[in-house]
UniProtKB/Swiss-Prot annotation:
PANTHER family, per database record: 30S RIBOSOMAL PROTEIN S2 PROKARYOTIC AND ORGANELLAR, SMALL RIBOSOMAL SUBUNIT PROTEIN US2M
Keywords: Chloroplast, Plastid, Ribonucleoprotein, Ribosomal protein
GO molecular function: structural constituent of ribosome
Main location: plastid
Gene that this polypeptide is encoded by: rps2
Protein name: Small ribosomal subunit protein uS2c
Family membership noted in the UniProt record: Belongs to the universal ribosomal protein uS2 family.
Keyword Ribonucleoprotein attached: yes
GO biological process terms, semicolon-separated: translation
Entry's localization field: Plastid, Chloroplast
Organism: Lactuca sativa
NCBIfam families: rpsB_bact
Length: 236
């Protein structure tokens, strides 16, 4: 894998609060190599390590995107949902930003059936088919459509398992991470000081609570994906 320059700036990361970890009582000892100090009762992440692993992640997604691979971004906490959707749409990635439905990947055949139902209902709505049904039936199907849009809207164009999954919060998305591990799908994961760095293929030490930190990390990854995709389009 070729190493590239991704303009990862330590000062920019400090301004975004990427270095702020959790309280010193709430930490995972496995994170010790990624922690540089304690300040006012919280751990401080070593941003040099963050820059290194973020750069590796950018190299990985660039190479994957340049070969036409598919990505899934997962982040379901309310405050990060919009950032996840924005990043995914910008890079033409699939995303889950509301709730991870258990078995979404490991029971792909069921997910696929739901997606077919979702697409059929969307088509019916667009063509006015739902409005021609009895009111009670139409109302029931519209509720079903709304539910599917909420939970599957970000993966509505996904036709198979993703090649790489980017996970914003290891604790919140633990089920998604375990499904990826079970299926052998490579993962890139933001890890705060209370996380386990051994669970993901590439773990990026970073504040997973501050929106500014999440956006900065996602912006770098999305830029790398977009750059890779542009190369794939030029040289299919």
């Amino acid at each position: 894998m070729t190493r590239r320059y991704w303009n990862i700036n330590l000062e920019e990361m400090m301004e975004a609060g990427v270095h702020f970890g959790h309280g010193t009582r709430k930490w995972n000892p496995k994170m010790a190599p990624y922690i540089s100090a304690k300040r006012k009762g919280i751990h401080i992440t070593n941003l040099t390590r963050t820059a290194r692993f973020l750069s590796e992640a950018c190299d990985l997604v660039f190479d994957a995107a340049s070969r036409g691979k598919q990505f899934l971004i997962v982040g379901t906490k309310n405050k990060e949902a919009d950032s996840v959707a924005w990043a995914a749409i910008r890079a033409r990635c699939h995303y889950v930003n509301k709730k991870w439905l258990g078995g979404m990947l490991t029971n792909w055949s069921t997910t696929e059936t739901r997606l077919h139902k979702f697409r059929d209902l969307r088509t019916e709505q667009k063509t006015g088919g739902l409005d021609r049904l009895p009111k009670r039936d139409a109302a029931m199907l519209k509720r079903q459509l709304s539910h599917l849009q909420t939970y599957l809207g970000g993966i509505k164009y996904m036709t198979g398992l993703p090649d790489i999954v980017i996970i914003v919060d290891q604790h919140e998305e633990y089920t998604a991470l375990q499904e990826c591990i079970t299926l052998g799908i490579p993962t890139i994961c933001l890890i705060d000081t209370n996380c386990d760095p051994d669970l993901a293929d590439i773990s990026i030490p970073a504040n997973d609570d501050a929106i500014s930190s999440i956006r900065l990390i996602l912006n770098k990854l999305v830029f790398a994906i977009c750059e890779g995709r542009s190369g794939y389009i030029r040289n299919p």
